[in-house]
Amino acid sequence: MDPKLLDILACPLTKGPLVLSEDKTELISKQAGLAYPIRDGIPVMLESEARSLNVDERLDK
C-alpha cells in the first residue's frame, strides 16, 4: 500500500486514522474497532465489509 494513500485515507465512520496491519491485508481503525480488508491492493472502505476487532486486537498498540 502506498504510504501517501495511507496518509490520506480515514475511517469512514470516525474520520480517524487508519493503520496498515502487519500482514498488509487490512486497514485498522482502533477508534471504530474495525478492520477494513484490502483486496487486490484496493482498500474496501465499507462498514458492511469490515470485521470487528477482537479484544486482543483492540488492546494491541
Swiss-Prot record:
Any single Pfam family the record assigns to this protein: Trm112p
InterPro entries: Trm112-like
Top-level taxon of the source organism: Bacteria
Listed GO CC annotations: cytosol
Listed PANTHER family: PROTEIN PREY, MITOCHONDRIAL, ZGC:162634
Recorded family membership: Belongs to the UPF0434 family.
HAMAP family (UniProt xref): UPF0434
Stated name of the protein: UPF0434 protein PA2980
Originating organism: Pseudomonas aeruginosa (strain ATCC 15692 / DSM 22644 / CIP 104116 / JCM 14847 / LMG 12228 / 1C / PRS 101 / PAO1)
